[in-house]
Amino acid sequence: MVVLGSTGSIGKNALKIAKKFGVEIEALSCGKNIALINEQIKVFKPKKVAILDPNDLNDLEPLGAKVFVGLEGIDAMIEECVSNLVLNAIVGVAGLKASFKSLQRNKKLALANKESLVSAGHLLDISQITPVDSEHFGLWALLQNKTLKPKSLIISASGGAFRDTPLELIAIQNAQNALKHPNWSMGSKITIDSASMVNKLFEILETYWLFGASLKIDALIERSSIVHALVEFEDNSIIAHLASADMQLPISYAIDPKLASLNASIKPLDLYALSAIKFEPISMERYTLWRYKDLLLENPKLGVVLNASNEVAIEKFLDKEIAFGGLIQTISQALELYAKMPFKLSSLDEVLALDREVRERFKNVARV
C-alpha cells in the first residue's frame, strides 16, 4: 500500500496496522517531519518516498528509495505505484489532487483527508473510497443491516476544547487553549476544527456524499467519544455504534476489512463504565458556525468555501494574528458571501480556482 502523510497521527497508526497485518509499504510521503520519515524508511523500506520541500532533500535518508518532491511529486509517485490501495492522510486541500490521482489510477482510496470530499465530493467515485474516521466507519457498520430501512444518520461530536468555556470568553481564546482537546490527541488543525465545530460540518458533508443525500443528516454531542454514530430507521428504532476512542479501528478496516474483522485493534469497552453517556444538542450559541449546517446540506458545493476560509483562518489563528472569534468571523463572512453566488464546479480545476479565490479574498483578515 501507499501511505500519504505517514508522519501524522493517522499515518503513524496506519503503519502500525500495516505492520501487524503484514502489508508491504510501497511508498511514503510526509510534509516537514524528515526525522520521522527517515525512521519509517528504515523500518518499512519503501521503494518510493515523497517530501514537500526541496530544502529538506539534504536531510532525507531514502536508503535507495526513489525520491519525489512537492505536490506534483506526490502525483507522479502515485502514477508510478503499483499498489492497489492508497491511504491519503495529507492534511488540508493539499490532499485533494492526490485523491483524484489515486482514483484516476483505479486504486482503492482509504480517505482520511476530509477536504477531498468536502471540496469535491461530487467529482469523486465514492464506490472506490473507504472513509478513515470513527463516525463514518460507525455509519458504515450500522448500514450493513440491509433489512432495516434508514431514515436519518447521526454522528457524534466531543464538543472540543471550548465545550465548557463561559460563552463570553470563547471569542478571545487563543490557539494554545484550542489545542487542549478533552478526549483525543490529534494534529493541530483537526483539534482546532473540533473546537470550532468545523470538523463536524466537514463530516456532515462527507456523510452526504458517502451515504446519500436523501437521508436526514445531523450531529449531536456525546462527550466521552464512545458513541460514534447512530442510525434511525423508518420503524423509529435507533441503533448506535459504540467503540473505544481509537482511530486504529477505522484504519484497520480501510486497510483490510477481512483481517480487521478477525483481529482486535482496539481495547474492549467496559460496559459497566458507560453510565456517563449522555447526548446533548449542538448549541448554536456556543458553536455559532453550526447554524450553517442546513445551508451546506442544501448547497454542498459550498464546502470548498468552508474549507478554504477555514484553512486561511486557522493559519492566522496559529500565527496569533487573530483570536478564536476572528476565526469564526472569517468563515461566517465567507459562507454568507458565497451563498449568494452561483457556481457549478464541474471540474477539479474549477474547484481549485474557487479555493484560490476564497483564500485570496480572505487572507487579509482584520485582527479580531
UniProtKB/Swiss-Prot annotation:
Alphabetically ordered keywords of this record = Isoprene biosynthesis, Manganese, Metal-binding, NADP, Oxidoreductase
Where is NADPH bound in this sequence? T7, G8, S9, I10, G31, K32, N33, N113, E115, G187
* Gene3D superfamilies on file: 1.10.1740.10, NAD(P)-binding Rossmann-like Domain
Pathway this chain belongs to: Isoprenoid biosynthesis; isopentenyl diphosphate biosynthesis via DXP pathway; isopentenyl diphosphate from 1-deoxy-D-xylulose 5-phosphate: step 1/6
Q: Which cofactor does it need?
A: Mg(2+); Mn(2+)
* Stretches of the chain forming a coiled coil according to its record: none
What positions does the entry give for Mn(2+) binding?
Answer: D133, E135, E203
Instruction: Spell out the NCBIfam families in the cross-references.
Output: Dxr
Protein's name in the database: 1-deoxy-D-xylulose 5-phosphate reductoisomerase
Organism name = Helicobacter pylori (strain P12)
